[in-house]
Swiss-Prot record:
UniProt KW keywords: Ribonucleoprotein, Ribosomal protein
Gene: rpmC
GO cellular component: cytosolic large ribosomal subunit
Family to which this protein belongs: Belongs to the universal ribosomal protein uL29 family.
Protein name: Large ribosomal subunit protein uL29
Entry's Gene Ontology molecular function annotations: structural constituent of ribosome
GO terms, biological process: translation
InterPro entries for the chain: Ribosomal_protein_uL29, Ribosomal_uL29, Ribosomal_uL29_CS, Ribosomal_uL29_sf
Keyword field contains Ribosomal protein: yes
Entries under NCBIfam families matching the protein: L29
Entries under HAMAP family matching the protein: Ribosomal_uL29
Transmembrane segments: none
Length: 62
Protein backbone atom coordinates (compact mmCIF):
# COMPACT_ATOMS: atom_id res chain seq x y z
CA UNK A 1 0.00 0.00 0.00
CA UNK A 2 1.42 3.34 -1.05
CA UNK A 3 1.24 6.48 1.05
CA UNK A 4 0.13 8.45 -2.02
CA UNK A 5 -2.95 6.26 -2.35
CA UNK A 6 -3.80 6.85 1.29
CA UNK A 7 -3.38 10.62 1.07
CA UNK A 8 -6.10 10.78 -1.60
CA UNK A 9 -8.57 8.81 0.56
CA UNK A 10 -11.16 10.41 2.82
CA UNK A 11 -11.04 10.14 6.60
CA UNK A 12 -13.90 7.62 6.61
CA UNK A 13 -12.12 5.45 4.06
CA UNK A 14 -8.94 5.57 6.14
CA UNK A 15 -10.80 4.53 9.28
CA UNK A 16 -12.39 1.61 7.42
CA UNK A 17 -9.02 0.58 5.99
CA UNK A 18 -7.43 0.75 9.46
CA UNK A 19 -10.15 -1.46 10.92
CA UNK A 20 -9.77 -3.93 8.07
CA UNK A 21 -5.99 -4.10 8.50
CA UNK A 22 -6.32 -4.56 12.27
CA UNK A 23 -8.66 -7.52 11.78
CA UNK A 24 -6.32 -9.01 9.21
CA UNK A 25 -3.37 -8.59 11.60
CA UNK A 26 -5.31 -10.45 14.30
CA UNK A 27 -5.95 -13.35 11.90
CA UNK A 28 -2.34 -13.44 10.73
CA UNK A 29 -1.05 -13.47 14.32
CA UNK A 30 -3.42 -16.31 15.11
CA UNK A 31 -2.07 -18.27 12.13
CA UNK A 32 1.48 -17.50 13.26
CA UNK A 33 0.88 -18.90 16.74
CA UNK A 34 -0.86 -22.01 15.45
CA UNK A 35 1.97 -22.69 13.02
CA UNK A 36 -0.05 -22.28 9.82
CA UNK A 37 1.58 -19.06 8.60
CA UNK A 38 4.27 -19.56 5.97
CA UNK A 39 5.11 -15.92 5.21
CA UNK A 40 6.08 -14.46 8.59
CA UNK A 41 7.01 -11.08 7.12
CA UNK A 42 3.31 -10.43 6.60
CA UNK A 43 2.98 -9.52 10.30
CA UNK A 44 5.50 -6.69 10.11
CA UNK A 45 4.13 -5.48 6.77
CA UNK A 46 0.63 -5.25 8.22
CA UNK A 47 1.89 -3.37 11.27
CA UNK A 48 3.64 -0.86 9.00
CA UNK A 49 0.51 -0.43 6.86
CA UNK A 50 -1.57 0.23 9.99
CA UNK A 51 0.97 2.83 11.10
CA UNK A 52 0.81 4.52 7.68
CA UNK A 53 -2.98 4.70 7.83
CA UNK A 54 -2.96 6.10 11.36
CA UNK A 55 -0.30 8.68 10.50
CA UNK A 56 -2.14 9.99 7.45
CA UNK A 57 -5.45 9.99 9.32
CA UNK A 58 -3.84 12.05 12.09
CA UNK A 59 -2.44 14.47 9.47
CA UNK A 60 -5.89 14.95 7.96
CA UNK A 61 -7.54 15.58 11.33
CA UNK A 62 -4.85 17.87 12.67
Amino acid sequence: MKANELKNATAAELEAKGTELTKELFNVKFQLHTGRLENTSKVSNLRKDIARVKTILREKRG
